[in-house]
A protein has these predicted regions:
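Active-site helix of classical SDR
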Residues: 46, 82
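C-terminal helical subdomain
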Residues: 124-216
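Active-site-adjacent segment of SDR/Rossmann-fold oxidoreductases
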Residues: 53, 71, 87, 92-102, ...
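Conserved amphipathic alpha-helix within the SDR
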Residues: 1-6
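Substrate-binding pocket helix/loop in short-chain dehydrogenase/reductase
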Residues: 22-23, 30-35
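Active-site loop-to-helix junction immediately N-terminal to the catalytic Tyr of the SDR YXXXK motif
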Residues: 26, 72-80, 92, 120
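Residue(s) in the substrate-gating loop at a strand-loop-helix junction
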Residues: 66
Length: 219
């Protein structure tokens, strides 16, 4: 591809299919095919462009998730799993690409397409022009784009979606029981303390710091 078209600095990976069925009726082939097109297909595209972006110290990648993967939707276990996988892929590529000025983001589009035309009434579809997604994608591909951002877009609405973790609590070993979790669940699940973590180690460091504070251990 690069031999024919030259350097590729911008990539939007958006290929997809549907094989909707309830989980009880879904065949292994239905699950595997959707993951192959959505998740593996995105991997192949990113992999093909990655080293060139690293060599040039510049790249912008947008992968495509879905509200089905972020929030769930009946009959789309395969599609939801594939689209949720995009978030993990984005998180790692954004971390690895940071030093080479490669910014990786995710778009969660809601638009009138062949995949949605049978799911919504005509008056709703009329509001959901695919063109309403374009500004968000172009922003995420821009020189001043953020990185590791999930942006929702549809019908002229734009929002940022985050995976967050509550502050939680640290329990003494005597309380490492399901009963103690139940007793403290309101505090554990208190979303007023929720934060978006920057990477996997930040979570590990938080848990270790909480445990050290309880034990009086200086790290």
């Amino acid at each position: 591809m690069t031999k024919e078209w030259g350097a590729v600095d911008l990539l939007c990976a958006n290929a997809g299919i549907l094989r909707d069925k309830s989980f009880a009726k879904m065949e292994v082939a239905d699950f595997a095919k959707v993951l192959d097109v959505h998740l593996n297909g995105t991997f192949y595209c990113c992999k093909a462009m990655w080293n060139g972006m690293r060599e040039r110290n510049y790249g912008r990648i947008v992968v495509t998730t879905s509200s089905s993967g972020l929030f769930g939707n009946f009959g789309q276990a395969n599609y939801g799993a594939a689209k949720a996988g995009m978030i993990g892929l984005m998180n790692v590529l954004a971390e690895e690409g940071r030093k080479n000025n490669i910014r990786v983001n995710t778009i969660s589009p809601t638009a009138a397409t062949r995949m949605t035309e049978e799911l919504l009434p005509p008056q709703a579809l009329a509001l959901m022009k695919p063109e309403s997604i374009t500004p968000a994608v172009l922003y995420l591909l821009g020189e001043d784009a953020p990185t590791r951002t999930i942006m929702g877009a549809g019908a002229g609405s734009f929002a940022v979606i985050k995976v967050v973790e509550t502050e939680g609590i640290n329990l003494p070993s005597v309380d490492w029981t399901p009963e103690a979790i139940a007793a403290h669940f309101a505090e554990i699940s208190d979303m007023s303390t929720a934060k978006a973590l920057e990477n996997a180690f930040q979570q590990t460091n938080k848990y270790v710091s909480q445990a050290a504070a309880r034990a009086g251990v200086k790290l």
